[in-house]
């Protein structure tokens, strides 16, 4: 498609893959390369053809395109994306699903369910980190207010399971721990607070200074730590980085006084360093702080 303002349609070479669930694997059974010229391009070779369980447009990633998954294909992925062994095909499905979620064409809870199904079988750290980040954004920012707590609880359960199953001391373990801290609600606050004092820390997980600030900020966001605890952490990490993180933790607190102080500092104090300003802005708005 093209906008009315810029109606130019360019030719694309597009792969159309047909995948069928066989012996617990989503296997590609057909691949057609199609040249797209117009707004609609009939594909005669597929007329009367079995649609399979998944139809993947732009299979093999031949062109730069924003594609959509049909309802049947999406239902297949939500149920069995872990059966799609081809990493490129799986990456294309992840990309399409995230585009649909961001464009309000896929419910946030369905995206979180999809991530929960496929995340355990992903081994690439970049993919794991991106999926955790995107699922967290979907749960916190894109879900309906009335469903948000349920969606976040589901995500927290997914991340807790991933953390439990991750290899001790691995980067994947850190990715799950970071995600859990970011997505955590008040129900997980006791666990996170325990990590700060060395209690029930998963085997191999290093609670270094970076992780400590992530935990402090998460706890500040849900009102489980306040100014005294943030000041104590800053005394422990009396560095420029510590000062920046403390500013963010204070801005995350769910009180009118904390928000007013952060707002004033961000909008009226020209001496605020760039990274401190970034922390203030990043932590100021929290979707779960609606009052």
Language-model region placement:
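Ser/Thr- and Asn-enriched, surface-exposed coil loops between beta-strands
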Residues: 37-41
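Long, ordered, helix-rich scaffold segments
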Residues: 6-9, 19-32, 42-291
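Gly/Pro-rich turn-and-neighbor structural signature
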Residues: 1-4
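Extended, Lys/Arg-enriched charged tracts that mediate electrostatic binding to polyanionic substrates
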Residues: 13-16
């Amino acid at each position: 498609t093209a906008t009315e303002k810029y109606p130019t349609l360019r030719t694309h070479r597009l792969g159309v893959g047909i995948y069928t669930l066989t012996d617990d694997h989503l296997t590609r059974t057909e691949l057609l390369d199609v040249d797209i010229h117009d707004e609609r391009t009939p594909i005669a070779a597929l007329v009367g053809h079995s649609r399979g369980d998944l139809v993947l447009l732009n299979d093999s990633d031949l062109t730069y395109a924003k594609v959509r998954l049909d309802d049947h294909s999406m239902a297949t992925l939500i149920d069995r994306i872990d059966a799609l062994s081809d990493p490129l095909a799986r990456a294309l499905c992840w990309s399409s699903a995230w585009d649909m979620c961001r464009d309000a064409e896929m419910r946030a809870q369905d995206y979180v369910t999809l991530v929960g199904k496929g995340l355990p079988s992903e081994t690439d750290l970049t993919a794991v980190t991106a999926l955790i980040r995107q699922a967290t954004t979907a749960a916190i920012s894109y879900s309906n207010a009335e469903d948000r707590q349920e969606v976040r609880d589901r995500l927290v359960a997914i991340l807790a399971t991933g953390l439990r199953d991750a290899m001790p001391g691995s980067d994947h373990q850190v990715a799950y721990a970071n995600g859990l801290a970011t997505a955590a609600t008040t129900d997980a606050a006791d666990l996170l607070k325990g990590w700060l004092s060395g209690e029930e820390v998963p085997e191999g997980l290093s609670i270094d200074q970076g992780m400590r600030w992530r935990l402090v900020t998460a706890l500040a966001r849900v009102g489980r730590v306040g100014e005294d605890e943030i000041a104590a952490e800053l005394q422990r990490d009396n560095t420029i980085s510590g000062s920046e993180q403390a500013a963010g933790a204070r801005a995350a607190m769910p009180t009118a006084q904390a928000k007013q102080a952060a707002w004033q500092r961000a909008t009226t104090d020209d001496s605020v360093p760039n990274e401190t300003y970034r922390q203030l802005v990043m932590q100021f708005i929290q979707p779960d702080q609606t009052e």
